[in-house]
Amino acid sequence: MLRQLNLTREISRWIFMPWQRGAAGTASAEPPALPINDVIVDYDGPDLPLPEYPQRPNEPLEIRKQRLVYQSRKRGMLENDLLLSTFAAKYLKNFNEEQTAIYDQLINGVSNDWDIYYWATDVKTTPAEYNTEIMQLLKEHVKNTERVQRFRQPDLT
């Protein structure tokens, strides 16, 4: 992190403060040489390891449900925030321990939130490992047969 900060500072000086490029006010035409170790490459590759979601085997059921309510509301994309928060508000309180564990695996085991959205809306086929009773319940919830307006997340109770 510190190396990245130093690299950013050096690049900013070279671009935005040309009077500080050289020593004692002399401007050099070349940017400062950067060590190859400071270059950060960020890319999507098939060989990148995905982080594993930590299992919480001894977590009490009520604490787990509270965590899942929070995680359903804070997905990082509005579509899933609305779908999952309304789903959790409607169904999560009545889930038993097994159903809660399945829902936990569904929203935290998938590495890409767009996959959850596409599976729930039947745009893509749901893989067998996630095609559970909870996913079927989520798909029914997404169909919104009651025509409930979902413009905002439900209030916390």
UniProtKB/Swiss-Prot annotation:
It comes from the Eukaryota. One of its GO terms (biological process) is mitochondrial respiratory chain complex II assembly. Coiled coil: none annotated. It is found in: Mitochondrion matrix. Pfam families: Sdh5 (PF03937). InterPro entries: SDH, SDH_sf, SDHAF2. One of its GO terms (cellular component) is mitochondrion. Keywords: Chaperone, Mitochondrion. This protein may be expected to contain an N-terminal transit peptide but none has been predicted. Interacts with the flavoprotein subunit within the SDH catalytic dimer. Belongs to the SDHAF2 family. Plays an essential role in the assembly of succinate dehydrogenase (SDH), an enzyme complex (also referred to as respiratory complex II) that is a component of both the tricarboxylic acid (TCA) cycle and the mitochondrial electron transport chain, and which couples the oxidation of succinate to fumarate with the reduction of ubiquinone (coenzyme Q) to ubiquinol. Required for flavinylation (covalent attachment of FAD) of the flavoprotein subunit of the SDH catalytic dimer. This is Succinate dehydrogenase assembly factor 2-A, mitochondrial.
